[in-house]
Structures are given as structure tokens and as C-alpha cells.
Amino acid sequence: MWTSIAAPMMSWVMPEVLVNRGCIIRPFENRGDRGNREIISVTSVDSCSVYTLVMVAALLAAAGRRVASAEEAYRANPRPPTDGLVGANYTPAYAVNQVQFWHDFRPEVVERELAAAKKYFGITTLRVYLHNVNFDEEREKFLANIEQFLQICDRHGIRPGFVFFDDCHRHEGIYLDEPTEPVKGYHNGRWAACPQDRDRDPNDPEKLKPYVQEVIRPHRDDRRVLWWEVFNEPHLKSAYSVRLRKLGYAWAKELKPVQPVISCWDDNEATDVVDAHNYRAAFDRWDRQAELNPAKGCVFTEAGARWYAPRPSNGEPCEVIRWLAGRKAVGKYVPGVYLCWELMVGNSNCRWYWGTPEGTPEPTVPWCGLLWPDATPVSLAEAEAVRRYVTGQPRAMFFDDFQDAPRPSRPGWTAYGGAGPGDSGYLPLGAGTKMVAGHPKWTDYVLEARVMLKSETRGNAGLVFRVNDPGPGHDEMRGYYVGLDTRKLYLGKMQNNWQPLAEFDLTKLDCRVRPDVWNLLRVAAEGPRIRVWLNRMHPSADPDRGLRIELTDEREPILSGAVGVRSHLVEAWFDNVVVLPAEELP
């Protein structure tokens, strides 16, 4: 029975240690290979604690400074503490599935996408699927592509884990020489279960052993690889899948890799680390999963997704990061997370929800995916939240995710003309209300927020920027306003009255603005130049990449001011408000 002993409380993260019959073993290592373990004999729990203190002092002395962030602790440890593991599942934007990824391997695309993942999010790890079809039909090319992929990851300080088998989605019809196209509206419609049903011989599962072992063997002591995952979401009522999970784990462990070998679901006999999935925003269940087996630790290899109408949030990135930070703040164990299902909003079509019918219009905000195919963030607020958590280095001038919004006031905000903020998790405004934050001397910046109209009326809601002299009246301020109703996007100037500047017809977009649906609104103000983006979609439906309005205000432009949110003749909700210097605009 493993016993967990927490490291002394400090302002940096120390890996917890595990005690078993007088030995300390660092977590996230291969417990089946004594030759690769760092084992120190101790005589008691007290001496273990003393050893931990000594090691803390030694590490600090060796480093010459305190470890200031999870990212630094991650880099300093070849078997990192799980709180430094923040990433996403990865298939390049061009690929419909993992078979196409490895067959049509494009290193220049992978390089660009991973560089962006590190730049915008500080990502430290990726979860990457393999397939026996590639191994069986082009073995040398497949293994060479894995090595090249690892080289790219290593250049960007990213450590991937690899998945061998998967019971999800298409069990038939996937062939190396028969490429398939994405189907609009069909979530993961071309994803390849592994193995395909034609290769699932219950009398000969051993034929898959070379696939597992020949991938692991050249990398069994390769610190660029974080873990090996035998089976993603096996059907537990399938005798074949349950048996293959057990066999795959044994095949991997035969090679005594330095990396842990893991497998779904949660804790089981075929995993060295609890392998958890969660797509709900009720974080009490996340807590239970994180603490299922303290001796093993936990990684959420699928950690939530965004809100998709009419359903509630599935654990969007800002919520998950706030949950992690909350656990860390009170000294609780912090698991690793792979956010929002996948890194790229690409041809996997996971921007749509599970089970959406073919032909469904583009969503206003992708359900899954952190980066667009051009390697820019879907949400600057999400990028700020994740990067700040991982690196400890904020870039935002202002950020509010409203995860702890109190009644009836909100620190950093001033309300004008109506009721103040309400429930936690978002900012609700009554009709005829505006709230202002920031500094009147701010000049060039990018402002982004999510906006939801609560009914279809002649009213509108949106963002105010370069705000000066605000008051309680609807138009009482000097500055700019960009707002939307279900038909149009409006940009105008306010000087205690309304001066329209530009409009955009929203009805011509494939994604439609509707009540009770989130919209993603972004404004860049640089000198007199103003640009507005709304509800960017996949490039197949949106060649303008979300840019809806662009103009230069040549008549007495307002060049500085604060920011805020506004509702006019309609109740509206707001979330994930961020302000960044203009140079941070992708």
C-alpha cells in the first residue's frame, strides 16, 4: 500500500514523494524498472520528511534560485510533477484523423502549430494518437516520422505522450490509400478507431504486439516522451477491448520503459497514473478523480470543452485553470490537464458537439480547439489564463473570468445605470447598464470578451473602449461602442450621444447570432485605426478570418481611455474579458 507524504509548503511546487516499505520513489516514473528508479532507503516517515527537507535545500542551492512556476519545475525534473503538465490532444489542422497525420506528415505545419502552442499558451505537453494501419503498411516511414515529431516537440519544450489503441468513432472504412474528407457538422466524423474491426481477431490479439513494442523500444529511455497510453476509452463491455488493454500494458512493461504506461478509464490495473476524462463543469467530480489514487497521481488526458448551445459549459479552459489554481493555492495535489480536447480547430471537426447532424452551420465559438489553422488563438482570454498559470508571467493589462463574481459589486469595475453583477461564472447585465474598468490613459490595446444576448429584441449589447467621463445615461460617456443584435454588428462613437461609424450584416454569416448563445467579440484600437472581429469560423466558411469591421476614424478620434461592457434594451451576459497591449495581437 503506497502512502503519500506531501512536501513542505513553499511558494514553489515540490513533487510529492511516495513511501513503500521504507523507500522513497519519485512520482511519475516507471515503478517496474529498478534500474531506472531513484530509490533512497529510509527507516521511518519522520526520516522521510527530513530527507525531503534536505532535498529541497539541495535543489534550491543547485538551482541558485527558487523555482517560480510550474513550467520551471517541469523543466527541472525529467519526471515532472503533474502540476506542470498543461497541454491538449494534437492532430494537425490539415488531418481528419491520426492515420492521415502520420501518412501525410508535414513537419513545417507541425513546427508552426507547436511554436504557436508554446508562444500563446505555454503548453508543455501534447497527447498524440498513433495507429496500427500506419505501422503495418509503412513501418519505417511511420517510425521515422515519430522521431521527427519528437525533434520538433523538443525544440519547443513540449513532451508528448502517445496513444496506441482507441475504441472511439469509426471502426470500419479507414485505409491508408483511401483518404477521406471532413464532413461539415459531423464531430470527429473521420476519426479512426484502433484497431479497425477488420483487425480485431479475438483469437490473435498478439499480432498487435509488434506495433506497441517497436514504437516504444527505440524510445524506452527517451526523456522527450512523457508517457505511453495503451488504450483510450476502451468499451468495458467488450471482452476484446478489455483483454487488449491488459495485454497492451503487459507488452509495454516488458520493455521496462522509463516512462509511465497509462490507460483509461480513471484508475485500473493497466495504468501507472490515473487516466481521467471529464466534460462537465461540476468540479466536485474533478476533485474526486484527482484524488482517486494518491500513490499514482492523476492526469486528465481529456479535460473539458467549451459551452455549446443549448448545453452548459463542459469545463472550458478558463474554468479548468481556475480549478487547478484553486487546488494549488490551498496545498492540494494538482493533476495534469489536456484542455478543450484538442489543440487545433481543424479538419477533425470537433468544433461541433457530439452527435450534431451533417450540415449543421458553423458554431459561433468552437466547442473544442485552442488554435485556428493559421496558428492564432481562438480566445486571447484563454491564452492569457493558461499561459499565466503555466509560466507565472501575465501579459494582460486587465483580465476577468468572473469565476468568483460576488454580489452586488465587482472589484475593478464601476457600474453605471442599472443593476450590478450577479452570479458567479459570468457577468449578467440588465438592460440599460454599462460597467467600466481600466485606466483612461490606456492608448493602443486589444479588448476581447464573450457576449450573450438573453432575448431577441431591438436592443444590443457589446463592448465600450477608449472610455472617458462615463455616467449613468445610456450614451453618457466619451469613447467608442461596438455591439450586436441578432442581425447586425454596430460600431459607433459616443460623445454623450450616438454617432454611427460602421455596420456589418450578420445574417450573411454561416454562424448566426441567436439568444442564449455565446459570441466572441474582439476589438483592436491602434491610433485612429479600429478593427472588429466577431465569431471567427473555420477558414472553409470564413476567408476573412472573423474580421467584420475595419476603419480609420479621421474626425477627432478618441485615442485613449478605459474599457467596459454595455447592454442596451436587452439583458446580456459577458465572460472572459481581457485587455492586452496592441503588440500582443496575433
What is each of the regions a protein language model found here?
Residues E554-P586:
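Ligand-recognition surfaces built from glycine- and aromatic
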